[in-house]
Amino acid sequence: MVSEAPPFWWTKADWRAYALWPFSWLYGRIAGMRMDRARRATSAVPLICIGNFTVGGAGKTPTAIAIARAAKARGLKPAFLSRGYGGSLDVTTLVDPEHHRARDVGDEPLLLAREALTVICRRRVDGARKLAAEGADIIIMDDGFQSARLVFDFALIVVDSGRGIGNGHLVPSGPVRAPIGNQLRHATALLKLGHGSAADPVVRRASRAGKPVYVAETVRIDEGSLVGVKVLAWAGIADTEKFFKTVRETGAIIEETRSFPDHHHFSEDEIADLIDRATSRGYTLVTTAKDIVRLEPGHGRAGELAAKSRVIEIEVRFDDPAAPGKIIDAALASARARRLREHKSG
C-alpha cells in the first residue's frame, strides 16, 4: 500500500491520473476480487471494523475511540485490534502505553491503548483470538477493511467531508483502495465526518445502495485559550492542512507551519529546528496527540519538544448521540446471528 498520497490524488483528475490508469485498472481488479472472494475467518466475539475507502487518514482512530467509549458506557469491555503500522514489532503484542514506544507498536495503537485493551498483530486473525482470550466483549478494528481476513459484524466506513475520495481514481491514479462498488458490498454503514460537501457523491451512492449514513464532526477539547497566541504548528499526519485549519479555529495566529509525512519518526535535527525556531521567535509550539506519542522522552531533545508543545486534542461527536449505541447493538445482533448460523452448519 502506498504510504504517502501525492497531492494530485486530492484534486481534479489530471494527465497524471489518466497516465496511470492502466495500472489502476489492474490494481482495482485484484483488490476487488480479493475483497469479494477471500475466505474470511470469524471472530469469537463481535467485531466492528472502522475503515475508509482511501489511502490516508479519514478520522478512523478518533471514531474507533468514540465507539469504544460508548461500549464502555454500556458495561461492555471493548478492545482494539490494529496492524501496528509504523511499528517494528511483528509478533502479536498487547500494547502497554507505559512501556512501548511508537517505534515498537505504531503511534495510533499507543493512543488506542490509553482508552482500552489494544493488540497489534500483522495477522489480524491471530490478534482477534488474542483479544478474545483476554476477555474482550467486543473488538473494534482500526483500519483493515480491505484486508479481507476477518468477517465483520459491522463495517463502518469513515469519509472525510472535506476530502471525500479525492479524484475518485484507484491507486496509483488516485487514493481509492478498491473499486467503490466492491467496498460498498462489504460496508454496513458510512460515517460522514464533518459538514463539507466533498464526500457527498460517495455518500449519495452509498444511500442508493441502501447503506445507512451517519454524520459526526471532530471537536476540539480545549485546555486553555490560544486566542491571539502566535504559534508554530507542526504535524506529521495524513492531512496536515486539516490540522492547521483546526489550529486557526482556536483563534491562534499561525506564524509558521511544519509538515511531515504520516507516522514520521523525527530526527534530532528536525526536533532541534522546531524548538530553536519557536524559542528564538517567541512562538508557542502546537501539534497533535498522534505526533506527541512519537516523541521519546530521554531520547535527545524529544522530551523537551513534547514538554514545550501544546496538544490540540480532538474527539468525534455524532450528530445523533444514540448512533454509537445503534452501531454496537447492530454488531452484537449480527454476531449472534452469525454464531447461530455457524452452530446450525456445524
Curated annotation (Swiss-Prot):
SUPFAM superfamilies: P-loop containing nucleoside triphosphate hydrolases. Its EC number is 2.7.1.130. It comes from the Bacteria. ATP binds at T54, V55, G56, G57, A58, G59, K60, T61. The keyword Manganese does not apply. Pathway: Glycolipid biosynthesis; lipid IV(A) biosynthesis; lipid IV(A) from (3R)-3-hydroxytetradecanoyl-[acyl-carrier-protein] and UDP-N-acetyl-alpha-D-glucosamine: step 6/6. Keywords: ATP-binding, Kinase, Lipid A biosynthesis, Lipid biosynthesis, Lipid metabolism, Nucleotide-binding, Transferase. GO terms for molecular function: ATP binding; tetraacyldisaccharide 4'-kinase activity. InterPro entries: LpxK, P-loop_NTPase. One of its GO terms (cellular component) is plasma membrane. It is an enzyme of class 2 (transferase). One of its GO terms (biological process) is lipopolysaccharide core region biosynthetic process. It catalyses: a lipid A disaccharide + ATP = a lipid IVA + ADP + H(+). Pfam families: LpxK. Belongs to the LpxK family. NCBIfam families: lpxK. Transfers the gamma-phosphate of ATP to the 4'-position of a tetraacyldisaccharide 1-phosphate intermediate (termed DS-1-P) to form tetraacyldisaccharide 1,4'-bis-phosphate (lipid IVA). This is Tetraacyldisaccharide 4'-kinase. It comes from Sinorhizobium medicae (strain WSM419). The lineage of its organism: Bacteria, Pseudomonadati, Pseudomonadota, Alphaproteobacteria, Hyphomicrobiales.
